[in-house]
Amino acid sequence: MNIYLVQLSWQILRYSGGFALPLQAESKQLTKRMMKRVMSMLACLVMAVSSMMAQSDKIVGNYSVVRNGVTSKVKVFKHGDGFRAQVTWVDNLKKEDGTLRTDEKNPDKSKRGVRADQIVLIDKVTYDAKNNVWTNGKIYDPTKGKTYKVKLWFDGDKVLKMRGYIGPLFDTSEWKKID
């Protein structure tokens, strides 16, 4: 079986222009039927990869979030090798004294001046195609100034569920996709 795959790969490279080698007697046995099979397998591979990529990008978009009585909008986008979620709008951006709300509980003092409508909530999540979830990242809770592990998944087409957890303790919330 392995020899067949090696020969097939070699022949694909030669016929696709990968190598400019003279045809040998064994390669002349490659028939149109064999080429159709090879092309069909390549087409299936391309479709499978593109389908998986489309599924991983399903998380990208804008979401409405209601948490602790505060409504906000969050944008999820590709960032590096994973995805990031950042606040883009908060319904109560100004405090009662007229000053802007900031990330004042952030343990990193250099980030305490970040406006509430610019806080990065989720970072470095990646798609796990086997389990149809986004994991391996962190979620930040600006109300507590704490960061947790995170797992995200869809419940239907428009509801993104996320679970922030530390060991066996977790909290699950929902974001509603608005575009």
Residue ranges, per PLM feature:
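Bacterial N-terminal signal peptides that target proteins for export
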Residues: K32-M41
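Bacterial N-terminal signal peptides
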Residues: L42-V49
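N-terminal helix-cap/turn-to-beta initiation motif at the start of protein domains
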Residues: M53-N62, F170
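Central antiparallel beta-sheet cores of small beta-barrel/beta-sandwich binding domains
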Residues: V60, V65-V66, T71-Y140, T147-Y148
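Acidic, glycine-rich flexible loop segments
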Residues: G137-M162
